[in-house]
A protein has these predicted regions:
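A cytosolic-side transmembrane-helix exit/cap motif
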Residues: 141-142, 161, 212-219, 304-312, ...
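Aromatic-enriched
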Residues: 318-393
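Membrane-embedded alpha-helical segments of transport systems
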Residues: 169-172, 200-204, 339
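Hydrophobic transmembrane alpha-helices
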Residues: 104-108, 145-154, 176, 180-184, ...
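Primarily membrane-embedded glycan-assembly and transfer machineries that use lipid-linked glycans
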Residues: 2-159, 184-304, 384-389
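Hydrophobic/aromatic-rich transmembrane helices and adjacent perimembrane loops
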Residues: 303-318, 364-366
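Transmembrane helices and adjacent periplasmic/lumenal helix-loop junctions
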Residues: 164-182, 299-309
Length: 393
């Protein structure tokens, strides 16, 4: 990152993790402002537990309970269980604290230097609040992907496999953790643990239901995701991605997203051919940043709250490289913060927010530019450390 940003964030007050934790707790409390107006997502999540216990469909509509339908896997019933059995306001408050705490801890226990962690805490705070207002699990997905990477990097394949499988069986996004497989020093061990955790976590919801019910719900989940993907393509609230950006700005609807997804996957995979760079932590961390952005840019299910994932990736891209970022990188991060981070905020005039940002999925634009820049760097730059970095930074 630039020297000015580093000096600013190194101030004892701004870099105090206890203060930052306090701010994130306050943001969680602020998320409760939606309790008396719109906490529909929490009601859906709560319903996942109770419908599992009662043996009713997890993917049917229950208009007397909540709007919309659930799209999370049966395993989610166990994650939400401690919060679902409490009175609604207590359950929702603890849920928001749980989500914020999980991501805060994942960043804290990562391999990122303190200065990099502090940058993420500050930069992503506003986007975190947006996700908290929606009570969304995307906050935890960011934590799961981070944990998958750094646990593999620290040779804790067993726990890395746990988080990869957990994220996959809850919201599919976790499967991107498999992208870090090539960085593992114990690939056979990782494969074995993936198999073990897949069996354990697949069976786990049966503890509060039955085998036939859970197997049936996984089948329903697949069908619901296929149907949801079709709906997302034309939804204003969904597909806030590179796919949606291209579709809405061009006005062309009669083509397959594979025309964008396949080149995107090729560009994403190309840096993995640079085997000589694997030894450089900055290279591997930039791959992590690419994964965090790719999962949002190339998913029709990308929604406003998902940008906590992409912005975490943007912060990692900006801070981990061994060279100093220039003015263009700083300008791009400002663009990311304003449009991708605040694009859904009431601080943006309503007519701009609704008629342009939302209508054309413009929140994806800065992240798309940044990701393309990132891919270019991954394919051309040398990530060998050029200076010794203080371990306390």
């Amino acid at each position: 990152m630039s020297d000015k940003v580093k000096r600013f964030l190194s101030h004892p007050l701004l870099s105090n993790r206890r203060l930052l934790l306090g701010i994130w707790i306050i943001l969680s409390l602020a998320g409760m402002l939606k309790f008396h107006r719109s906490y529909n997502n929490f009601l859906i999540f709560k319903g996942v537990y109770w419908h599992t216990v009662n043996g009713t469909s997890l993917y049917a509509a229950y208009p007397t309970e909540y709007r919309d339908v659930n799209h999370y896997g049966p395993l989610f019933s166990l994650i939400i269980a401690p919060f679902a059995i409490l009175p609604e306001w207590i359950g929702m408050l603890l849920w928001l604290l749980f989500l914020s705490g999980w991501l805060f801890a994942a960043i804290y226990w990562s391999g990122l230097r303190k200065s990099q962690q502090v940058y993420i805490y500050w930069f992503c705070g506003f986007t975190l609040l947006t996700a908290l207002f929606m009570q969304q699990f995307n906050i935890a997905i960011a934590a799961i992907i981070l944990s998958s990477f750094f646990l593999i990097d620290k040779e804790h394949e067993g726990w890395a496999a746990f988080f990869i499988v957990l994220g996959t069986l809850v919201k599919l996004y976790g499967i991107v953790g498999l992208a870090f497989f090539l960085f593992s020093r114990h690939k056979v061990r990782l494969i074995l643990w993936l198999a073990v955790w897949s069996v354990i976590l697949f069976l786990a919801p049966m503890a509060i239901s039955s085998p036939d019910y859970i197997i049936g719900q996984y089948q329903e989940w697949y069908s619901s995701l296929v149907a949801k993907n079709t709906e997302n393509i034309h939804s204003i609230a969904q597909n806030i991605s590179l796919l949606g950006l291209v579709r809405r700005t061009t006005g062309c609807m009669n083509y397959s997203d594979l025309w964008l997804i396949l080149p995107g996957m090729a560009l994403f995979a190309l840096p993995f051919l640079r085997f000589s760079q694997y030894k450089n932590l900055a290279f591997r961390e930039t791959i992590l940043a690419s994964v965090l952005m790719f999962v949002i840019l190339f998913s029709t299910g990308s929604e406003s709250s998902g940008y906590i994932i992409a912005l975490t990736g943007a912060c990692i891209w900006y801070t981990v490289v061994p060279w100093k970022r220039g003015k263009w990188a700083v300008a791009l991060m400002v663009f990311v913060f304003i449009l991708s981070g605040m694009g859904n905020s009431d601080l943006i005039p309503k007519w701009i927010r609704h008629d342009y940002i939302q209508q054309y999925a413009l929140r994806a634009l800065p992240i798309s530019i940044l990701w393309l820049w990132l891919c270019y760097e991954l394919c051309t730059k040398d990530y060998t450390p050029i200076e010794k970095v203080d371990a306390d930074e």
